[in-house]
């Protein structure tokens, strides 16, 4: 047995409990400022602590990890899996409980990638939230146009598309004549619905205040788009230096382009030793049906909670792959939709893509794309 340590992490305090091989306990409270973290590290070194465990409390564990990970074997644990016994809830007892289950080897650490992957993750997740904000800003622009009875969004597939942007920019400049706005709409949209219908959709009542609201919202969307592009530039720089081979290999899969490949690497890394089997990474991503069985009856097969960032990204890639005619994903999707709904078929393809990704990164071999003649 080794000397082990359990840390109960809070926003402004850390409760530490060391359990030695002979059963002795050392308990102490620390602050969260860097000098306090250095003092914690020195104390752990002094007592020859080998293994440390702490709960994944918000982002408060990250500074502690950065100070300690180079000197100790640290396990970051999901609080759900190490719940304390009823009636024993206090900060000191929590730290002691974490140390106890660590000493008895009853816990498994979460997947924490190497520092360079963590940097990529910061960009990836920033992109995730920027895309959400961009969608909200575009929806707000459409609400302003609807208030002015400009109904172009009823006839275009993408409210963030070029036709909408050109029309919005023209309205902001004060050009509200429907005949002028009509010329800015893509010919395909005009041919599909007719010039008279599109012209009527562009006829509205627009005030000076409406134009100002459009201008402010348009500047907001431009800011989000610029920041997303900056994040991709930084990610590309890191990937070209460290993961160029893996990025090229991932792009051999239908539905995965360079931007998606970089974001996948940001979430799972390139070393698949952390996931013993493809099934392990599928479960970690939340793409594996759960096993809810009692008395021989299956109660449910809903997918587990997992990495939402990776899951959303893989579903987007799966949708692109399913529309690649001739690919195995296209025919799998067509087959599955005959007996299940669209979303379940997409999720099944997302799982298939993740299994392929695991094999590609494990074997460092490209995906052999087999296209079937239509």
Question: Model-found features: residue ranges?
Answer:
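A detector of single, family-specific signature residues
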Residues: 1-374
């Amino acid at each position: 047995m080794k000397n082990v340590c359990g840390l109960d992490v809070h926003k402004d305090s850390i409760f530490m409990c060391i359990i030695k091989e002979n059963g002795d306990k050392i308990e102490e409270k620390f602050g969260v400022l860097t000098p306090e973290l250095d003092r914690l590290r020195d104390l752990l070194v002094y007592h020859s602590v080998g293994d440390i465990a702490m709960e994944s409390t918000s982002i408060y564990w990250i500074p502690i990890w950065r100070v300690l990970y180079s000197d100790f074997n640290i396990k970051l644990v999901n609080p759900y899996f190490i719940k304390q016994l009823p009636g024993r809830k206090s900060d000191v007892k929590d730290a002691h409980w974490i140390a106890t289950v660590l000493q008895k080897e009853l816990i498994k650490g979460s997947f924490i990638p190497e520092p360079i992957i963590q940097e990529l993750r910061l960009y990836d997740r920033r992109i995730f939230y920027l895309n959400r904000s961009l969608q909200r800003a575009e929806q707000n622009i459409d609400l302003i146009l609807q208030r002015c009875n400009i109904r172009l969004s009823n006839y275009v597939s993408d409210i963030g598309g070029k036709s909408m942007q050109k029309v919005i920019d023209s309205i902001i400049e004060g050009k509200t004549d429907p005949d002028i706005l009509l010329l800015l709409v893509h010919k395909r949209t005009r041919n599909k619905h007719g010039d008279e219908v599109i012209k009527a959709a562009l006829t509205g009542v627009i005030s000076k205040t409406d134009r100002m609201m459009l201008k402010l919202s348009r500047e907001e969307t431009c800011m989000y788009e610029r920041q997303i592009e900056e994040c991709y530039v930084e990610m590309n720089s890191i990937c070209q230096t460290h993961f160029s081979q893996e990025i090229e290999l991932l792009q051999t899969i239908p539905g995965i382009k360079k931007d998606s490949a970089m974001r996948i690497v940001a979430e799972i890394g390139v070393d698949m030793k952390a996931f013993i089997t493809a099934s392990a990474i599928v479960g970690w991503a939340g793409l594996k049906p759960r096993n809810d069985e009692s008395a021989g009856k299956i109660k449910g097969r809903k997918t587990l909670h997992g990495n939402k960032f990776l899951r959303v990204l893989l579903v987007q890639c799966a949708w692109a792959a399913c529309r690649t005619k001739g690919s195995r994903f296209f025919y799998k999707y067509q087959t599955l939709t005959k007996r299940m709904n669209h979303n379940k078929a997409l999720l099944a393809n997302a799982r298939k893509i993740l299994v392929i990704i695991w094999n590609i990164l494990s074997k460092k071999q490209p995906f052999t794309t087999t296209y079937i003649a239509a």
